[in-house]
Regions:
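Intrinsically disordered, low-complexity regulatory regions
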Residues: 223-483
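Hydrophobic transmembrane signal anchors and adjacent membrane-proximal interface regions, especially
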Residues: 3-6, 11-13, 32, 36-47, ...
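Acidic, serine/proline-rich low-complexity intrinsically disordered regions
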Residues: 193-196, 238, 492-496
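Phenylalanine-focused residue identity feature
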Residues: 5, 11, 24, 47, ...
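Eukaryotic acidic, Ser/Thr-rich intrinsically disordered low-complexity regions
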Residues: 486-489
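Basic, glycine-/proline-tolerant helical and adjacent loop/strand elements
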Residues: 80-232
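N-terminal alpha-helical interaction blocks
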Residues: 1-134, 145, 425-431, 435-445, ...
């Protein structure tokens, strides 16, 4: 018998189809007469003995349930181990078993053999006359009888009622899902995606490519890396992930550094936000890694000589409260997430703004973080400008001058520089900086070169069409030198790694 599971241009169901292929391949190892193939638009399954096939698939589903959906944890009050589902799993608990252990309500996970028999019986039943057939909401194909109506357990994008039991509303025509799509959707929870729990919400990262073969090849590159035994995060240490963009930054660094990914895989990530509340109305965002940012990451990582873009750059940045002289951890984590987002979305202007000290807080950049920041600046912006590299020293030294002026006056000049909208406003702020610099005493100017501002003026006039880019570079170097000048030896003892 031959069955086809076709893609339907839906990220959840199509990933489920690719996941079925992975399951079928496992079955092949035990039964050579069972064969599966993956094509760009479908997965083909061939078998002779359906009972033998279902028996083995049921065993695999049972294993996946404990590997991917459920986890054992000690009860905080009693200290007794109990079985709980991971927080983002949108499947209800069922009745506890005879030992008082939690189970899942979906029968395919509680009694996989019987339920798989029912599902494959429906799949292999030929449709009757078209008048009595139903149309699947996901794939659009006709089928005779559903295994279950669509609900959030099999398709998370449905709008939920409080009981988590179905779709809100009474639209009878918008709840039918064929047995094939149900099977793909319900087993997608046992697939190789990324997840991260953040207390009030969880993120699920689902990769997508319209070509199932390419999707399968991409997922094969990272499956072994995922720590699926962790309840809260399967991408490294849970406490070192601050949000969805820092998670992706860490993940792509792994792909480049460990999985030796040389080219941007052209994957669209569907990021599902699951609220930690009774009504699970989810939100789906998309992210696609741009080729330019992938190149910057690859080049920068290749230059690090043992350092880590994530561990030594991102985790080497802190916000410190000036008055209390201590790390402000909530703000630090928000800053790291914001920097990750600005970088991955190719927004250098936004990236620069995150380094501006504000509200009686200053930013600490550890030595390694500063070195890596400079590499990012060069690979991301300076090379793109096409300006000879020797002119970069003019920008850096001018940033040092601005930092010295700001430290001994106030940060208003830096804020003014950040807000300029025209080249005329830019020149006005630079004249004000020059006037303030003259008032500095000899002790304060011995580590800067005031004459460099003349070179800066010549540089900006020569490349005036790029004055905004040069302003951004000047600004981020000013922030970097302000961080150096505000640095205290005890800051180096604050480490969250």
């Amino acid at each position: 018998m031959e069955l086809e599971f076709k893609k339907c241009n839906d990220f959840w169901i199509d990933n489920g189809v690719e996941n079925l292929y992975k399951i079928f391949r496992k079955i092949e190892k035990y039964h050579p007469d069972i064969e599966s193939k993956i094509k760009p638009d479908k997965v083909i399954l061939q078998f002779e003995d359906i009972n033998k096939f279902v028996d083995k698939m049921a065993e695999i589903v049972e294993e996946l349930k404990y590997e991917r959906l459920l986890i054992e944890e000690k009860d905080k009050k009693t200290g007794v181990k109990k079985r709980v589902k991971k927080d983002y799993i949108l499947i209800q608990y069922g009745s506890k078993d005879s030992k008082g252990v939690n189970t899942l309500k979906e029968k395919i996970y509680t009694n996989p053999k019987d339920e798989l028999n029912k599902i494959f019986n429906l799949i292999t039943t030929k449709p009757k006359s078209s008048k009595s057939n139903k149309v699947c909401l996901c794939c659009g194909e006709e089928f005779s009888k559903e295994y279950q109506n669509m609900k959030q357990a099999s398709y998370p994008m449905t709008t939920k009622i409080k009981s988590l039991g179905g779709i809100r509303g009474n639209a009878e025509n918008y709840k039918e899902i064929c047995p094939k799509c149900y099977l793909a959707g319900i087993l997608e929870w046992a697939d190789d995606y990324l997840y991260k729990y953040l207390g009030d919400k969880s993120y699920i990262f689902i990769p997508y490519n319209f070509n199932l073969v390419k999707l399968n090849e991409f997922k094969d590159k990272y499956r072994i890396f995922l720590n699926n035994s962790n309840r809260y995060c399967n991408i490294g240490e849970n406490r070192e992930i601050y949000g969805k963009y820092s998670a992706l930054l860490k993940f792509y660094e792994y792909l480049i550094d460990n999985a030796k990914l040389n080219e941007n895989p052209n994957i669209v990530w569907h990021i599902i936000t699951v609220p930690n509340k009774d009504i699970k109305n989810i939100k789906v965002d998309k992210f696609e890694m741009m080729g330019e940012i992938f190149r910057v990451m690859k080049v920068t990582i290749g230059e690090l000589d043992g350092d880590s873009l994530y561990g030594d750059f991102l985790n080497g940045i802190y916000i410190k409260e000036e008055r209390k002289n201590k790390i402000e951890w909530e703000g630090t984590n928000e800053l790291r997430e914001g920097i990750s987002e600005a970088f991955l979305t190719n927004n250098f202007r936004k990236f620069v703004k995150y380094f501006i000290p504000k509200n009686k807080h200053y930013i600490i950049l550890h030595n390694d973080a500063r070195k890596i920041l400079e590499k990012i600046i060069i690979n991301w912006r300076w090379i793109k400008l096409g300006i000879p590299k020797e002119h970069l020293e003019t920008i850096k030294k001018s940033g040092n001058v601005i930092a010295e002026v700001c430290i001994h006056n106030n940060l208003n000049l830096l804020y003014k520089l950040d807000k300029v909208r025209t080249s005329e406003e830019f020149w006005s702020v630079m004249r004000e900086i020059s006037r303030k610099m003259i008032s500095l005493d000899a002790e304060n100017t011995k580590y800067i070169n005031p004459m460099v501002l003349g070179d800066l003026i010549s540089l900006v006039k020569e490349y005036e069409k790029d004055w905004k880019e040069l302003r951004d570079l000047l600004e981020i170097y000013s922030c970097m030198y302000i961080s150096i000048k505000q640095y205290k030896p005890e800051d180096n003892n604050n480490d969250n790694k």
